[in-house]
Amino acid sequence: MAATQEDVKLLGIVGSPFVCRVQIALKLKGVEYKFLEENLGNKSDLLLKYNPVHKKVPVFVHNEQPIAESLVIVEYIDETWKNNPILPSDPYQRALARFWSKFIDDKIVGAVSKSVFTVDEKEREKNVEETYEALQFLENELKDKKFFGGEEFGLVDIAAVFIAFWIPIFQEIAGLQLFTSEKFPILYKWSQEFLNHPFVHEVLPPRDPLFAYFKARYESLSASK
């Protein structure tokens, strides 16, 4: 179906990996949309209307029907616009893609955040080890494939934009070595291929202001020790 700017909206914030997932999917599908930037310190009535349960972004609105949660949104986009498929057609491969995408959210996003934004050294060490373990699983899963989706990127790659783009920012700020080419050569090579893909590169947020924002947050936390 043809989509216009009037019937597709995305409520989000610049710099969110979860919002970025949706933007990559929309770019891949060639869907035009209106981006409504939110201020999470002063949430809009529109956000509260469209996502009263979690009150967070991203929220995707298609013909006034709101959908929340980034991976759910990406699947909806894939089912609605059939070109450039994001999920495999094979049921087993599709189930695996969902498994690894959820694995990234469950085992990596939280552990990385706790590795960086904590004042408890034991907690930091624990989460660094959990991050290493989780990334190793993905390294093994990727093997000799160009993308997790094969020759073209898919759901797992989109979910893993957090690894490719956000982890390098976080580890530089905190002086950690969470994700390096030496420790995870296969995954690191994938990250460069993925970030340089035009459908991804064109929707990534500007790195410098994002780095400055998270550095200020990290320094504020460190000062509170």
Curated annotation (Swiss-Prot):
Binding-site residues, glutathione: S16, K43, V57, E69, S70
Pfam family of the protein (one): GST_N
Induction cue: By heat shock and auxin; by heavy metals like cadmium, silver and copper.
GO biological processes: glutathione metabolic process; response to abscisic acid; response to auxin; response to cytokinin; response to gibberellin; response to heat; response to metal ion
Any one GO CC term of the record: cytoplasm
The enzyme's E.C. designation: 2.5.1.18
Annotated SUPFAM superfamilies: GST C-terminal domain-like, Thioredoxin-like
Gene Ontology molecular function: glutathione transferase activity
The keyword Mitochondrion belongs to this UniProt entry's keyword annotation: no
GST C-terminal domain: residues covered: 90-214
Principal EC category: transferase
Domain GST N-terminal residues, every copy: 6-85
Family annotation (InterPro entries): Glutathione-S-Trfase_C-like, Glutathione-S-Trfase_C_sf, Glutathione_S-Trfase_N, GST_C, GST_C_Tau, Omega/Tau-like, Thioredoxin-like_sf
Keyword annotations from UniProtKB, A to Z: Stress response, Transferase
Catalyzed reactions: RX + glutathione = an S-substituted glutathione + a halide anion + H(+)
Family: Belongs to the GST superfamily. HSP26 family.
General function of this protein: May play a role in the cellular response to stress.
The protein's name in its UniProt record: Probable glutathione S-transferase
Gene behind the chain: HSP26-A
